[in-house]
Structures are given as C-alpha cells and as structure tokens.
C-alpha cells in the first residue's frame, strides 16, 4: 500500500461571523460560512470545496478513462451540484450530481454512446473522492454527448 499526504492548514479567529484561511501546496483561499447560511460569504466554504473536490476528481478520472478507451479528441465541460440538507439541526451533503458535457468527433460519437455507461462507472470507481464519500453521499452522473 502506498500512502500520499495532502496537507492543508486552516486558520480562524473569534466566532462564526469571521473569515478564515485555508492554505495548501496550491490552494490559498479565504473561508467563511456562506451568506445563504447566514455567514459573511467571503471566499469559499467547506461545502463548495467538497463539491469542487468531487467535481474535479471525477472530470480528471473521466478524461483519463476516455483516453484509455481511445477517445482522444474530446473536451469535457461539467457542472456539479451538491445538495445539502438540514435534519435535526445537522447539515449533511445528501447528493452530488455531475453533468459532464462531452464533445467528441462525429466519427466517434456512436462508439462513445455504446460504451458510455461502462466508461462512466469506471471513471467513478477510479475517483478517490467518489470512493471516499460513497455510502454517505449519493453520487449521480447525468452525461451529455455533444
């Protein structure tokens, strides 16, 4: 087994109406409670970062899966929506829905349509974030081929 450490430091002062900082090798972002939840809404927030992590992991995994399946001249634009709920005073991410729009050469469109379901599952199974949240967060994939 090989382990990889991803180190992020966070800073916060005072109460809930403040702005903190999340910093890693590349990320250097202000963090706060979203304004939609009564916070100051500056920078990003853990909910958005969770959806961004799931989305970026899935799109990278999907691109690699399509490449290994010999679909080389593609582009993917994806929207991902995280749906959270408040139940008994506790917030929980219920679902993350990925909607990849895959552009492929016309000559490969039919072949991709035939193999797409299997390739989507392979990509999801190879995504570390999907593997980490599966069982706690429902992951939906609604693809479009352009």
Predicted regions span which residues?
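Extended beta-strand/beta-hairpin segments
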Residues: 1-52, 60-146
